[in-house]
Amino acid sequence: MKNIRVTVEYDGTSFAGWQRQSGAIVTVQGEIEVALGKILQEKISLAAAGRTDKGVHARAQTANFFTASSLEPSRIVHSLNSLLPQTIRISNPEEVDADFHARHSAKERQYRYFLIEEPSAIYGRFAGCSFGKLDVAIMQQMAAILVGTHDFSAFSKEDRDNPGRICSVTACKWYPCKHYLVLRISADRFLRSMVRYLVDAMIRAGKGRLSVGDFCRMLETGVTTSQLNPALPAGLFLWDVLY
């Protein structure tokens, strides 16, 4: 059996997330596995670095799968891209060691969130919207507070009783990029919807609706003291994965 690693780029707008689901629900993983099954004539199960939510995109998701096929990885990917919708592209195929796992072998994941201040028919497809001016200095202050190891219980959709809610954030910063304000955040791992909850908290602070003190208390106690909602998925990209 060969272990094949690939990079997956996708526009998540029309997908119900990465993870395969039963029935007729269309997901990125499901589309790729069906196409691989046709090419390789065997049942394929993909592992991925991150299970992105409905509507979330990826610039460089990493995935791997095992196959008994003798086809070269480059031929597999060429055939794969001919079968997949244009909203999914596969690149950088390579055979890797049998113990490589896209999720478990990852050392760091980087996400970026693209934000605009007013709705836009052009720029809004791949962005969240704050619907008003923001105090970026306050948002930058909050981003800096996130660097380090914390319990992110207050910023996740996951069951509060589940263990393993500690994440180590290595970098977090807002920066301007053309029409967007972009959050770049890197960590060893992320909880479900964690980035989108953090973005919503920072937007609220940037509009004067959440204090830095309340934000810090949520981070320290793991208890949400403000009614947070995950920011729109359209602005979020899984940007890179380091091994």
From Swiss-Prot:
Its EC number is 5.4.99.12. It comes from the Bacteria. Keywords: Isomerase, tRNA processing. Substrate binds at residue 111. It catalyses: uridine(38/39/40) in tRNA = pseudouridine(38/39/40) in tRNA. It is an enzyme of class 5 (isomerase). Homodimer. Belongs to the tRNA pseudouridine synthase TruA family. Formation of pseudouridine at positions 38, 39 and 40 in the anticodon stem and loop of transfer RNAs. This is tRNA pseudouridine synthase A. It comes from Pelodictyon phaeoclathratiforme (strain DSM 5477 / BU-1).
